[in-house]
């Protein structure tokens, strides 16, 4: 969770905020390390499902589902990636999808974290203590979500 899980949990927090309820299931190694986790959140704006796995290959893609469409972020969604927007035209009487429009973008650039580095450099140069793009409060919420999930899964930290 603390390695790969931060990406899907951060995406959940950025799009829906901290859940009002959260349920987590996971699989622990013999040493008590979480190898795979599923975190389901209930939010005022909808539901979220975040997964991560340490001992297997995953696509690390993301799908955001809305009332009239989806946004799909391709492999390794946490960096610049391919994006596909699908918008459904809904029948006003039944609410059923009657047609669909797709738009694709390729936002891939080598590296992937240069935007974060540029924002950090900008804020440090300006003498700012935090970024409004991802304020400390958002970082704390992500950590609280992960801590709650890890506790539910059964991860225990050694006491020294």
Where are these regions (language model features)?
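Structural motif
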Residues: 47, 68-70
């Amino acid at each position: 969770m603390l390695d790969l899980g931060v990406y899907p949990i951060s995406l959940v927090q950025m799009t829906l905020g901290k859940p009002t309820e959260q349920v987590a299931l996971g699989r622990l190694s013999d040493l008590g390390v979480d190898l795979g986790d599923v975190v389901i959140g209930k939010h005022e704006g909808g539901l979220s499902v975040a997964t991560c796995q340490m001992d297997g290959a995953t696509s690390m893609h993301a799908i955001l589902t809305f009332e009239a469409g989806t946004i799909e972020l391709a492999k390794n969604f946490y960096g610049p990636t391919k994006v596909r927007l699908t918008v459904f035209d809904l029948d006003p009487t039944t609410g059923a999808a009657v047609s669909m429009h797709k738009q694709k973008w390729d936002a891939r650039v080598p590296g992937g974290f240069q935007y974060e580095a540029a924002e950090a450099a900008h804020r440090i140069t300006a003498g700012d203590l935090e970024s409004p793009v991802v304020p400390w409060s958002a970082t704390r919420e992500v950590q609280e979500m992960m801590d709650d999930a890890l506790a539910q899964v059964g991860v225990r930290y050694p006491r020294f």
